[in-house]
Each structure stands twice: as C-alpha cells, then as structure tokens.
C-alpha cells in the first residue's frame, strides 16, 4: 500500500528570520572565540619570548663574562646586524664625546708623582727588611784573588713570625710604714680585655684573618694549630664579638655621627646574610633567618656598615633620617621615606640620587636579547659615561660647569628619547622594563648634574659590599644578631683602613691598646681618617711596648673643628 503524497513544503517567512538570527549569533560567537584565541596566542607568544629571554640571560650569567663590560668582538658577534643599523647614532654620540675631549684640559699631576710602573717590580724601592746572602767562591777567596764586586738580584721572601707567649711581670714591693710591712703592687695598664687569654695583637690577627682575608674560624683554627697555638673557634668568636661591639659603640659610632652631620655625598646599598637564631626551648636548632647589611661610602672619608634584621623603610629612616645631603642609592622603595615623607619646617633634607649603572644593566639585558631599544639606550648611556670621564680629568673646581655644559645635553637627549620611545613600545618585556625604569627614575638620575662631586653610579657602594658577599660564602652565616652587629663595626674599620692605605692589623693592634685611655668626646680622632695624625702625636715607646699606659695628647685641631661644627650650638 503506497503512502499518500506529501504536501509541498513552503518555508514560512518567520522560519527564515529565525535562521538568520541564529546565523548572526553563531557568527558573533565565532568572532568572539577567534578574538579570545588570538589574545591567548599572543599572550602565550609573549610568555615564550620572555622565557627565551630569561633563558638567554641565565646562560650568559652562567657561561658569559661576569662583568658588565662587553668587548667589541663580543657585541659584534651577538648584535652585528643591530649595530650596523645604529651606526649613524654611534657617529653622532662619538662626535658629542669628541667635543668634550677637545674642550677639557686634564688636571696636571702633582710634582714628584711617580710614573706608572712598567715591567718587573723593582724590589730595591721596597721598604721591607733586607736579608743579604753573599755567595762566595771558596777557592778564589783562599787563593787571595781580589774581589771586585757583586752581581745583585732580589726576590721577595717570607718568614713566618708566629705566635709567642707574652709574660707580664708586675713588680711587688714591700713597703714599711709605721714599722708595719705592706705589699704594694704596680698598677697594670688599662685594657679592653681584663684577665684575657689573648693579647690585642692576637685579637687583631684573628679579626683581620677573618674579615680582611675571608678566612673562617675553622680554617684559622687549623692554621694556628700548625703554628703551635691551640685556639678553638668558640674562643675566637667570643673575642671577635667583644672587640666588634666595643669598636662599634666607640669609634664606628663617632664615624657614623660625623658622616651624617658633615658629609656631602653618601653612596649606599644593601645585601642579605644568614643569621643563626637561638635554639628553641626544648634545645632544637632553628633554620637560619635572613638579616641585612647596609653600607655607606661617605665622600672619600670612610666606608661604614650597619646591620639590621629587616630591610625596611623604618630602619633606613633611623639610619639616614638626620642626614642633610645627597644620598645615592638604587631604586628600592625603602629610601622613598627619606625624600617623600611628611613635610618638614626646613626644606633642607636628603636628596636622593639615582644610579646610571642600574639603568645600564636593564638596557644591557634588553640589548643581549636583541631588542633595538636596549642597544640604542646602551649606546647613549655609554656616551654619557665617556663624556663624564673626560670631565672628571679636569680640576675639581670646574667640573660642575663642564658637566652642565657637555654632559647635560647628552642626558637631556637620552630622556627625550626615552619618553618618545616609551610611547611606541608595546608589551611587557625587557625593553619596556628598561624604558620604565628610566622614566620612573628620571628626577633622581638627573640630580648627578647638580654638582661635579656626584658620581654617575652607585658602584662604589656595591664594591664595598663584596666583603660581605665573600664572607657569606666563606662562613655561611653569623652566629647571632649581636655577632652580625659586631661584624658590621669590624667591616667598617677594615674598609676604612683600606680606603686610607692603613694596615688593618697594625691599626687594630694599636687601637685596642689606646682606646681605654681615650675620652668619649674624642673617639673620632681614632678613626682611620685621622689615625696618622693622632698616632704621630703619641709617644713612640708607648706604641712599641706590647703592654703600656698611654699619655693622651691635646685634642687634634682638625677634628676639634669638625666636632665644633657638628655641635647643636653651631
């Protein structure tokens, strides 16, 4: 049985409209999905590019040159095509630097300055003690031949001085008074370490071995045992902590007060270090915590260190809050409280100065990852450094004017380029990071133009922190917060001794004997900056005797003038 024929299907007008609406909705959804997918793909591509750049930087830190200097051959291999495109910019910058070199006459060297040594060192100019060995011909000497001279040659030799036992013999006298005999003992000279096992010279040796040479106590313990001096590391740690705390509360404290009161430029930076906390109540050791060391390079007068448990704005305010001058630091926000704190009655305060070396690192990383922006910024910063190096060769009195005349145009051109390039550089990558750092730090970076005494960067503070970093690798951690504070004081003394070309061992050995006799208001006279003048006014026989009382001379005129200018009444 056949089915009846179906009626002709005629689409209604309403069905066509519904299909058109559904098609439009589907097309809109498809467009949205495509847009979302494109955004995700672009984001993933940016992530892949950033990870590739991070991998490039990590490989460079592992296998490349650890310094920030790049030799011409290295740049040509890595950035050959980019360098070719920036040839015109390089020529323009070279021309600007050439104008400075033509205009600036270098400062003449003082009369009597020795030329730079060439070839092998001439040991005949050394002030070291001499051991003369004559090599003779026994047969010719016995036969009566006339000796007509010697052929002299010199070598640097070493003789171990070693330890010795210092015996202090205090005389006792029988005194007869009113037919009665009494025993009278000569008063012993004052000392920082009464009834101590170690003399000040041994303490100075332990301190300089660890904090000047980076020898941890366990290695020093082995070396002392080889020399016949049995001294355990616990004893050494106790003496070092005692000496460091005394120096920190006296000489280093006076140096900090002098720096905050009289310095014009302070360069500062900070680094971390591990601190061993105390054991729990049940005697279990705890994991090390992190502390922080701040350094302050004070003009050309001192290098100081301070320890804190936390890297915070509160500590920075306590440390530098009373300073009135230029404070050069990195872009860490802990320093902002010094300049952007609550308004004060006086406009005089800390003026933060930026660091072109930090900016250069951001540009360098962008250039290594083949961003043209990074290379252009690097070339411009190099021109600023080259022009400023020429300015620094001029007499100090005219450096500010020369820097304003020749370096300022390069700095103005650099920041004009930064703002223009930042507007057309999209994304979140190393290029935008470098440009953002430059734009955010423009005010602080421009402050180097205010005076010729300001360096372009903060690298001298970073160099001062190297001893902390080397120690961090050598002895891993500090025993307590108190020991870290003592270490900061010792680092301050040793770094300042290096700055003023003093032997840290001799300085510490003599200071630890002189300090008990010095008055509190004159501790600055014992700082490395003034020690040569102070030492020259002490009696030589008192300094030469291992145990001696000291006659304190009148105040040093130069230090007295500094102290008077720092007093509240001035």
Where are these regions (language model features)?
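Active-site-adjacent "gating/activation" loops or surface patches in catalytic cores
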Residues: 163-218, 286-303
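Gly/Pro-rich turn-and-neighbor structural signature
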Residues: 121-124, 128-146, 218-322, 389-453, ...
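Conserved catalytic alpha/beta cores of large enzymes that bind or transform nucleotide phosphates
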Residues: 202, 207-209, 221, 360-399
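Acidic/histidine-rich catalytic cores and adjacent linkers
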Residues: 331-334, 379-570
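Conserved beta-strand -> loop -> alpha-helix junction used to position metal-binding or nucleic-acid-contacting
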Residues: 265, 326, 331, 342-376
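Short, flexible loop/hinge motifs at secondary-structure junctions
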Residues: 1-197, 263, 267-268, 527, ...
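Short helix/loop capping segments that flank catalytic or ligand/cofactor-binding pockets
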Residues: 149, 183-186, 275-277, 304-306, ...
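Mobile genetic element proteins and their domesticated derivatives, centered on retroelements
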Residues: 64, 140-141, 175, 206, ...
């Amino acid at each position: 049985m056949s089915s009846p024929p179906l009626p002709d299907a005629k689409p209604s007008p309403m069905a066509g409209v519904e299909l058109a609406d559904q098609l439009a909705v589907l097309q809109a959804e498809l467009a949205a999905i495509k847009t979302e997918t494109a955004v995700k793909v672009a984001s993933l591509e940016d992530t892949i590019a950033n990870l590739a750049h991070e991998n490039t930087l990590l490989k460079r830190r592992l296998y490349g040159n650890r310094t920030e200097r790049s030799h011409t051959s290295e740049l040509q291999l890595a950035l050959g095509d980019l360098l070719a495109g920036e040839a015109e910019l390089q020529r323009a910058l070279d021309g600007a630097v050439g104008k400075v070199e033509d205009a600036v006459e270098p400062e003449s060297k003082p009369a009597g300055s020795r030329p730079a040594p060439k070839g092998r060192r001439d040991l005949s100019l050394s002030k070291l003690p001499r051991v003369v060995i004559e090599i003779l011909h026994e047969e010719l000497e016995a036969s009566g031949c006339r000796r007509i001279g010697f052929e002299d040659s010199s070598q640097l030799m070493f003789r171990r001085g070693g330890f010795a036992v210092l015996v202090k013999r205090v005389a006792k006298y029988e005194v007869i008074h009113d037919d009665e005999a009494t025993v009278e003992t000569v008063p012993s000279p004052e000392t920082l370490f009464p009834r101590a096992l170690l003399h000040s010279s041994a303490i100075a040796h332990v301190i300089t071995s660890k904090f000047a040479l980076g020898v941890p106590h366990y290695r020093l313990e082995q070396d002392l045992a080889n020399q016949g001096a049995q001294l355990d590391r616990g004893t050494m740690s106790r003496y070092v902590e005692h000496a460091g705390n005394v120096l920190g509360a006296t000489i280093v404290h006076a140096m900090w007060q002098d720096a905050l009161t009289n310095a014009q430029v302070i360069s500062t930076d900070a680094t971390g270090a591990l601190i061993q906390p105390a054991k729990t109540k049940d005697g279990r050791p705890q994991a090390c915590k992190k502390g922080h060391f701040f350094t302050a390079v004070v003009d050309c007068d001192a290098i100081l260190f301070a320890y804190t448990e936390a890297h915070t704005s509160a500590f920075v305010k306590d440390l530098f809050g009373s300073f009135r001058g230029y404070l050069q630091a990195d872009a860490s926000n802990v320093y902002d409280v010094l300049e952007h704190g609550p308004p004060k009655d006086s406009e005089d305060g800390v003026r933060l100065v930026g660091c072109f070396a930090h900016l250069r690192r951001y540009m360098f990383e962008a250039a290594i990852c083949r961003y043209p922006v990074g290379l252009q910024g690097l070339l411009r910063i190099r021109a600023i450094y080259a022009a400023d190096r020429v300015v620094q060769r001029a007499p100090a009195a005219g450096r500010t004017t020369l820097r304003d005349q020749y370096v300022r145009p390069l700095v103005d051109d650099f920041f004009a380029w930064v703002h223009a390039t930042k507007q057309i550089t999209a994304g979140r990558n190393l290029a935008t990071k470098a440009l953002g750092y430059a734009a955010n730090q423009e005010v602080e970076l421009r402050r180097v133009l205010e005076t010729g005494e300001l360096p372009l960067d903060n690298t001298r503070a970073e160099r001062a922190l190297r001893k902390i970093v080397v120690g961090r690798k050598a002895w891993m951690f500090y025993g307590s917060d108190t020991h870290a504070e003592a270490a900061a004081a010792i680092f301050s003394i040793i770094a300042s001794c290096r700055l003023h070309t003093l032997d840290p061992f001799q300085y510490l050995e003599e200071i630890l004997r002189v300090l008990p006799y010095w008055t509190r208001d004159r501790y600055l006279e014992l700082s490395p900056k003034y020690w040569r003048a102070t030492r020259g006014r002490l009696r030589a026989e008192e300094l030469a005797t291992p145990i001696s009382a000291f006659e304190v001379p009148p105040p040093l005129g130069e230090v007295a003038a500094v102290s008077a200018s720092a007093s509240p009444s001035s």
